[in-house]
């Protein structure tokens, strides 16, 4: 269960925020022992765990995600969970703890931890998430796939991994762009060439560049 900022005094909120920011684990433990909730929300509606990732406060993060009472799936105001942020920052050991020991949600609706891992080209994190059942073609609110984010990152090995795990080249985002179009938009020439070659082998035709209109089924 998460606890709002209002449940704590402003002094406690300020002290905890500062302690997490500076990775002062002793102070964090002291405040929690004094009754401050480890599910406290701080700047920007961020859970302490998410804030710890943002501030690169590794000691504090490792401590917090190990506490049984911490809600690891509570998002910030942008819908980001600690697993998403740890994936974005390439924190594989923490990602493993969150999934294996805390049961953090991998396949949430919208943007997922896999999207976030692919955004910064974190191959090891993406590989691990896929091994744990992450949906390779998960769609964000804008119909962006992890493959599109991997293409933007420029990590060719990651792009290959996703394709080998079944990523669909034909998916287009809400603007009508495919992963191939994304490669060309972000000047990833080598990736674009490889994806076009793969397209021709799979679909026996040359790729015609986007964007293409995305068909939306009308309601009956």
Regions flagged by a language model, labelled:
Residues 3-16, 165, 174-177, 181-220:
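Ankyrin-repeat-protein effector appendages
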Residues 8-47, 51:
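N-terminal segments that cap or nucleate solenoid repeat domains
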Residues 27, 59-60, 93-94, 124-125, ...:
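Conserved ankyrin/ankyrin-like repeat signature
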Residues 18-23, 51-57, 85-91, 116-122, ...:
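Ankyrin repeat A-helix N-terminal signature
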Residues 88, 109-111, 115-127, 131, ...:
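Alpha-helical adaptor scaffolds
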Residues 40-41, 72-75, 105-109, 136-139, ...:
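Ankyrin repeat boundary signal
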Residues 32-37, 62-71, 96-104, 127-135, ...:
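Ankyrin repeat domain, specifically the short helix-to-loop turn at the C-terminus of the second helix
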């Amino acid at each position: 269960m998460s606890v709002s900022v209002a449940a704590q005094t402003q002094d406690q909120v300020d002290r905890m925020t500062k302690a997490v920011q500076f990775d002062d684990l002793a102070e964090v433990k002291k405040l929690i022992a004094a009754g401050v909730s480890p599910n406290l929300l701080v700047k920007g509606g961020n859970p302490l765990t998410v804030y710890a990732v943002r501030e690169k406060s590794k000691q504090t993060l490792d401590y917090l995600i190990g506490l049984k009472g911490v809600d690891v799936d509570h998002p910030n105001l942008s819908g980001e969970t600690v697993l998403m942020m740890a994936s974005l920052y390439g924190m594989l050991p923490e990602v493993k703890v969150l999934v294996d020991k805390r049961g953090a949600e991998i396949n949430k609706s919208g943007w997922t931890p896999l999207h976030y891992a692919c955004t910064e080209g974190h191959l090891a994190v993406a590989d691990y998430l896929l091994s744990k059942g992450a949906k390779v073609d998960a769609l964000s609110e804008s119909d962006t796939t992890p493959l599109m984010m991997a293409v933007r990152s420029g990590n060719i090995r990651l792009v290959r991994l996703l394709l080998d795990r079944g990523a669909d080249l034909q998916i287009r985002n809400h603007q009508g762009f495919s992963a191939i179009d994304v490669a060309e938009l972000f000047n990833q020439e080598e990736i674009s060439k490889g994806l076009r070659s793969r397209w021709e082998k799979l679909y026996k035709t040359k790729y015609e560049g986007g964007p293409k209109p995305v068909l939306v089924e009308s309601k009956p």
